[in-house]
Amino acid sequence: MSILGLFQKRSSGAVARDRLQLILAHERAESGRPDLVIQLREEILAVIANHVAVEPDKVKVTLERGEGVSTLGLDIELPLGASGKLDAKLAAKLAEVAANKGGAKPASSKKAA
């Protein structure tokens, strides 16, 4: 665009198109994918079901969007075993995940008494 083009009147169609594109871009950025939380919840529930039986209504997934950051919240009510403790296999897996998150090496697979 030349300097003379700066002072030229734009057609109303071009202005409307630009405004609509701007509105759509803002709405897409605000809403994201509405089905994302539902899909994440289903996939997380399927993975957890491989290790322990969990009632689907006891799994809550939230996605909060902030300035440049999205936070995924996960709240799972795990059932207690007959002895009042988590299943040993699940407890070991949770400990391994927690250790890996901190940058530590996975714990050895020793059986607890």
Curated annotation (Swiss-Prot):
Gene3D superfamilies the UniProt entry points to: Cell division topological specificity factor MinE
InterPro entries (alphabetical): MinE (IPR005527), MinE_sf (IPR036707)
Top-rank taxon, per record: Bacteria
GO annotation terms (biological process): cell division; regulation of division septum assembly
Keyword annotations from UniProtKB, A to Z: Cell cycle, Cell division
Physiological role: Prevents the cell division inhibition by proteins MinC and MinD at internal division sites while permitting inhibition at polar sites. This ensures cell division at the proper site by restricting the formation of a division septum at the midpoint of the long axis of the cell.
Family per record: Belongs to the MinE family.
Protein name (Swiss-Prot/TrEMBL): Cell division topological specificity factor
Gene (UniProt): minE
